[in-house]
UniProtKB/Swiss-Prot annotation:
Any one GO molecular-function label of the UniProt entry: L-arginine transmembrane transporter activity
Topology, Cytoplasmic side: 1-36, 83-107, 184-191, 255-285, 357-382, 428-475, 528-540, 591-619
InterPro entries registered for this protein in UniProt: AA/rel_permease1, Cat_AA_permease, CAT_C
Entry annotated with the keyword Iron: no
GO terms under cellular component: plasma membrane
NCBIfam families in the cross-refs: 2A0303
Protein name: Cationic amino acid transporter 3
Source organism of the structure: Homo sapiens
Expression (tissue specificity): Highly expressed in thymus, uterus and testis. Detected at lower levels in brain, mammary gland, prostate, salivary gland and fetal spleen. In brain, highest expression in thalamus, hippocampus and amygdala.
Origin: domain of life: Eukaryota
Length: 619
């Protein structure tokens, strides 16, 4: 029957990952300590942002109030980081948001998440490699770019770069080889570079507070006119705004915070190390929280020092810190800062490249991507094929493409992953424990099963009979979370696209927003009234269900700020991914194979959310 075939097809799209009871066993080498994960998170997050982004945001968007921008951005990133930390404690396996989605919301969403994570890491790797090449070229007087532009220029504007970047190509291939040697070797390099980076940033902070002038946070129009009279190249001056500490108003802080949010992207690479961390359930949450805290303190202190050292409208976006030291008369210090920037970009590059092959490996091992990509090198115990293939693709993009137009595309993939992880945490916290004692396979969220004593009623939505999660209460939360995702998307769309009528008091749009808010609040109350799982974890997100929902709202709102061209490129990337999934992955998925082999199915077990049985390795 056509209906039955359609139903079976739909079940394939939402089937959830089932794992063997010994899921702590891994073919990868468990060699990463908590310090390694903190170094990886700080290195990948505290990269180009602190040396480039701070100058751009302070000059054009926020002025000295950039310190508030970083605070707002850090708070929004912490929301996502807390959700990642809880999932890292629940499911200590490679794959990051991909696996988290697979065990919770189903195969199609998991593939979508993993496919976009691959896009984010590839673009991030290529763009940082280009930035490293440019920073090194600037340090030696731009000889590389001048030579290549004069001899091998590319004449395809808005598509390709001005010239092929052989330096970036070689850099990515070199680091690909380093990652292929093993995680512990690359972790050592990351720790060294991150240490140098933090020392340089410490020097910048101390210098800024010693040589800084509080008057630069109180600039007036007279100061601006004086600067124009003193400078010959007044075209390099940024806008004054209204002067003072918040020269561009509250709107400038929000615009700056939206940009600064991307300076914290990168901590999620810690969540991909579940099969290589020595104690993943403890070290992954600690690594995420500590790395985000360190990065916020560094961003806050450096941006404060930078805006105290020189007027915000005179900052150079491309190289704000070296120019600031020139401004205060410490010219030799710019070389110290240059070394720090190269170390920061190096760790950021490793941070982008490290999770890329591991997400590919996790998807290939599950059969959603080509199985050859899951091959493990017997000597180094690293995903050698996935590492080499992803490195070559990233090197090719760094070699030919100018990636400034693709940054927003990278952000969509990252924000989508953050949102799905938050939804997964919300759903899992309200599910009953699913340890399978009879050997029968049980999905993480099963269909609503009611008994004579448990029926779905309006009273039961707000006053459930049980104090522990049941299949019915778990299904209620699953459905309510799906409805909330739709309603929050609609609310963010209205706020982003029709903000002017709302601010002007348009009754229609005001009524729409009020209605959406009432529905959202009502569903949140229903979720809040359901019993939560009491499974002990090393880390749990506080204030459920509010914190995950706040994270989802912020992420979706930022996605709504993307341009139509960015969404069009996103659509092309997703078409390629769906062609692979429906042409190969849906038929070769491990879950598909299990469903066709009853003998194996009888022995399969789902994810055991009890850490005592889930993870047996001890340090």
């Amino acid at each position: 029957m056509p209906w039955q075939a359609f139903r079976r097809f739909g079940q394939k799209l939402v089937r959830r990952r089932t794992l063997e009871s010994g899921m702590a066993e891994t073919r990868l080498a468990r060699c990463l300590s908590t310090l390694d994960l903190v170094a990886l998170g700080v290195g990948s997050t505290l990269g180009a942002g602190v040396y480039v982004l701070a100058g751009e945001v302070a000059k054009d968007k926020a002025g000295p109030s950039i310190v508030i921008c970083f605070l707002v951005a850090a708070l929004s990133s912490v929301l996502a980081g807390l959700c990642y930390a809880e999932f890292g404690a629940r499911v200590p396996r490679s794959g990051s948001a991909y696996l988290y989605s697979y065990v919770t919301v189903g195969e199609l969403w998991a593939f979508t998440t993993g496919w976009n994570l691959i896009l984010s890491y590839v673009i991030g790797t290529a763009s940082v490699a280009r930035a490293w090449s440019s920073a090194f070229d600037n340090l030696i007087g731009n000889h590389i770019s001048k030579t290549l532009q004069g001899s091998i220029a590319l004449h395809v504007p808005h598509v390709l770069a001005e010239y092929p970047d052989f330096f970036a190509l070689g850099l990515v291939l070199l680091l690909t080889g380093l990652l292929a040697l093993g995680a512990s070797e690359s972790a050592l390099v990351t720790k060294v570079f991150t240490g140098v980076n933090l020392l340089v940033l410490g020097f910048v902070m101390i210098s800024g507070f010693v040589k800084g002038d509080v008057h630069n946070w109180k600039l007036t129009e007279e100061d601006y006119e004086l600067a124009m009279a003193e400078l010959n190249d007044t075209y390099s001056l940024g806008p004054l705004g209204s002067g003072g500490f918040v020269p561009f108003g509250f709107e400038g802080i929000l615009r700056g915070a939206a940009t600064c949010f991307y300076a914290f992207v990168g901590f999620d690479c810690i969540a991909t190390t579940g099969e290589e961390a020595q104690n993943p359930q403890r070290s992954i949450p600690m690594g995420i929280v500590i790395s985000l805290s360190v990065c916020f303190l560094a961003y806050f202190a450096v941006s404060s020092a930078l805006t105290l050292m020189m007027p915000y409208y005179q900052l150079q976006p491309e190289s704000p810190l070296p120019e600031a030291f020139l401004y205060i008369g410490w010219a030799p210090a710019r070389y110290v800062v240059a070394v720090g920037s190269l170390c920061a970009l190096s760790t950021s590059l490793l941070g982008s490249m490290f999770p890329m092959p591991r997400v590919i490996y996790a998807m290939a091992e599950d059969g959603l991507l080509f199985r050859v990509l899951a091959r493990i090198h017997t000597g180094t115990r690293t995903p050698i094929i996935a590492t080499v293939v992803s490195g070559i693709i990233a090197a090719f993009m760094a070699f030919l493409f100018k990636l400034t137009d693709l940054v927003d595309l990278m952000s969509i993939g990252t924000l989508l992953a953050y949102s799905l992880v938050s939804i997964c945490v919300l759903i899992l916290r309200y599910q009953p424990d699913q340890e399978t004692k009879t050997g029968e396979e049980v999905e993480l969220q099963e269909e609503a099963i009611t008994t004579e004593s448990e029926k779905l009623t309006l009273w039961g939505l707000f006053f459930p009979l049980n104090s522990i999660p049941t299949p019915l209460s778990g299904q209620i939360v699953y459905v309510c979370s799906s409805l909330l995702a739709v309603l929050l998307t609609a609310l963010c769309l209205v706020l982003a696209q029709w903000s002017v009528p709302l601010l002007s008091g348009d009754l229609l749009w005001t009524a729409v927003v009020v209605l959406l808010l009432l529905l959202i609040i009502g569903i949140i109350v229903v979720i809040w009234r359901q019993p939560q799982s009491s499974t002990p974890l090393h880390f749990k997100v506080p204030a459920l269900p509010l914190l995950p929902l706040m994270s989802i709202f912020v992420n979706i709102y930022l996605m709504m700020q993307m341009t139509a061209g960015t969404w069009a490129r996103f659509g092309v990337w997703m078409l390629i991914g769906f062609a692979i999934y429906f042409g190969y992955g849906i038929q070769h998925s491990l879950e598909e194979i299990k469903s066709n082999q009853p003998s194996r199915k009888s022995r399969a077990k789902t994810v055991d959310l009890d850490p005592g049985t889930l993870y047996v390795h001890s340090v």
